[in-house]
């Protein structure tokens, strides 16, 4: 059996260990479950979303326009 050693921020460690304890899961069990999921599904068990404020604004504009589409006239020359 192998082992993994990693460095994390002290505050993050304390918060995550406390949350895991509430769930009745050890950090080793949590990491093992995550690695099993990745091995079986070849993807992370959560969505990675790191958006800048500008990107988040753009996403909101796109969502709004999709909710309320308006016709747009475009000529072939403009394409």
Swiss-Prot record:
Function summary: Antitoxin component of a type II toxin-antitoxin (TA) system. Counteracts the effect of cognate toxin RelE via direct protein-protein interaction, preventing RelE from entering the ribosome A site and thus inhibiting its endoribonuclease activity. An autorepressor of relBE operon transcription. 2 RelB dimers bind to 2 operator sequences; DNA-binding and repression is stronger when complexed with toxin/corepressor RelE by conditional cooperativity. Seems to be a principal mediator of cell death in liquid media.
Transcription regulation in keyword set: yes
Recorded GO MF terms: DNA-binding transcription repressor activity; toxin sequestering activity; transcription cis-regulatory region binding
Keyword field contains Transcription: yes
Subunit record text: Homotetramer formed by dimerization of dimers in solution. Forms an RelB(2)-RelE(2) heterotetramer. Also forms an RelB(2)-RelE heterotrimer. The RelB(2)-RelE complex is probably the one that binds DNA and represses transcription, possibly as 2 heterotrimers, 1 bound to each of 2 operators.
Deleted gene: phenotype: Essential, it cannot be deleted if a copy of relE remains in the cell. Cells missing relBE have a higher steady-state level of translation during amino acid starvation than wild-type cells. They survive antibiotic treatment in log phase better than wild-type cells. Cells missing mazE-mazF survive hydroxyurea treatment better than wild-type; further disruption of relE-relB and tonB yields even better survival.
Gene3D superfamilies xrefs: Met repressor-like
Entry note about domains: Dimerizes and binds DNA via its N-terminus (residues 1-50), binds toxin RelE via the C-terminus (residues 47-79). Tetramerization probably requires amino acids between residues 66 and 71.
Annotated effect of mutating residue 45 to L: In relB102; a delayed relaxed phenotype
Post-translational modification: Probably degraded by Lon protease during amino acid starvation. Degraded in vitro by Lon.
Protein name from the UniProt record: Antitoxin RelB
GO cellular component, one term: toxin-antitoxin complex
High-level lineage: Bacteria, Pseudomonadati, Pseudomonadota, Gammaproteobacteria, Enterobacterales
Family membership noted in the UniProt record: Belongs to the RelB/DinJ antitoxin family.
Other comments on record: A number of site directed mutants give rise to a delayed relaxed phenotype; RNA synthesis resumes 10 minutes after amino acid starvation, an unusually slow recovery from periods of starvation, accumulation of a translation inhibitor.
UniProt keywords, alphabetically: DNA-binding, Repressor, Stress response, Toxin-antitoxin system, Transcription, Transcription regulation
Inducing stimuli: By amino acid starvation, by glucose starvation and by chloramphenicol; induction is independent of ppGpp. Autorepressed by RelB, RelE acts as a corepressor. Member of the relBEF operon. Operon induced by ectopic expression of toxins HicA, HipA, MazF, MqsR and RelE, but not by YafQ.
Annotated GO biological process: DNA-templated transcription; regulation of DNA-templated transcription; regulation of growth; single-species biofilm formation
Organism field: Escherichia coli (strain K12)
